[in-house]
Amino acid sequence: PQKLGLPVGRHVYVCASIGGKLCMRAYTPTSPVDEVGHFDLLIKIYFKDEDPKYPNGGLMSQYLDSLPLGATIDIKGPHRHIEYTGRRRFVVNGKQRHARRLAMIQAGRGTTPDDDTEQAVLRDQPDDDTEMHLVYANRTDHDMLLREEIDRAWLPRTRRLKVWYVVSKVPEDGWEYGVGRVDEHVMREHLPLGDSETIALVCGPPAMIECTVRPGLEKMGYDLDKACLVF
């Protein structure tokens, strides 16, 4: 058995021929980087006619859901130019970077390189004392695939991880976090201000990143060229 060998902060492409056309989607493994013999992907299935915005559903996710146990798939990687090498150190486009604090903004239903980085920091504690501040946004709390793991496994292990959830739709039961959209006010309240020892890790819809997140971070003192890494 072998290790996948995927550096922390990078992802793989799953490739398949669907309807006679090549389809590729990027996924971040949820299993530890040193896992031997297998790796895990957490994928939400977007079924046809489930969401009026996407009447055909997810092409790749439905294809994967249709595969029988024991089927094979093609993957390629690693992909992305950002890697977390541990204990506050990043490699970005081949250059070493250092961060005492991470300001993480994550929106969407999938798992991301942000999750991978968080797990790597937690695995190295107490040697890795990186502070992590996460704003995690989604339509509903049920769409936050890793929320249960964050609440039950990650948060109890460290005081260096601070999390603020934001949902578009208020849950039926009690909800003690944010409702609405991620904006500059939310970012200022739950993320550290920019300085030479803070890096922002951003993953989400392009429109949100360009229209809200990047302008907000710039007003908070972040150097967008050096301290804002978009996955």
From Swiss-Prot:
Write the Enzyme Commission number(s) for this entry.
1.7.1.2
State the Gene3D superfamilies in the record: Nucleotide-binding domain of ferredoxin-NADP reductase (FNR) module, Translation factors
| Cofactor: how bound | Binds 1 FAD. Binds 1 heme group. The heme group is called cytochrome b-557.
Instruction: Kindly list the cofactors needed.
Output: FAD; heme; Mo-molybdopterin
Q: What class of enzyme is it?
A: oxidoreductase
InterPro entries from the entry?
CBR-like, Cbr1-like_FAD-bd_dom, FAD-bd_FR_type, Flavoprot_Pyr_Nucl_cyt_Rdtase, FNR_nucleotide-bd, OxRdtase_FAD/NAD-bd, Riboflavin_synthase-like_b-brl
Q: Which residues bind FAD?
A: 25-28, 42-47, 59-61, 112
Catalytic activity of the protein: nitrite + NAD(+) + H2O = nitrate + NADH + H(+); nitrite + NADP(+) + H2O = nitrate + NADPH + H(+)
**GO process terms (BP):** nitrate assimilation; nitric oxide biosynthetic process
| Pfam families listed in its UniProt record | FAD_binding_6, NAD_binding_1
Q: Keywords assigned by UniProt? A: FAD, Flavoprotein, Heme, Iron, Metal-binding, Molybdenum, NAD, NADP, Nitrate assimilation, Oxidoreductase
The protein's matches in SUPFAM superfamilies, at most eight in alphabetical order, are given as: Ferredoxin reductase-like, C-terminal NADP-linked domain, Riboflavin synthase domain-like
Q: Where is the FAD-binding FR-type domain?
A: 1-85
The GO terms this record gives for MF are: FAD binding; metal ion binding; nitrate reductase (NADH) activity; nitrate reductase (NADPH) activity
CDD domains (alphabetical)? cyt_b5_reduct_like (cd06183)
**PANTHER family recorded:** NADH-CYTOCHROME B5 REDUCTASE, NITRATE REDUCTASE
* Subunit comment: Homodimer.
Entry similarity comment: Belongs to the nitrate reductase family.
Query: What's this protein's function?
Result: Nitrate reductase is a key enzyme involved in the first step of nitrate assimilation in plants, fungi and bacteria.
Name it: Nitrate reductase [NAD(P)H]
Which gene does this sequence derive from?
A: NAR
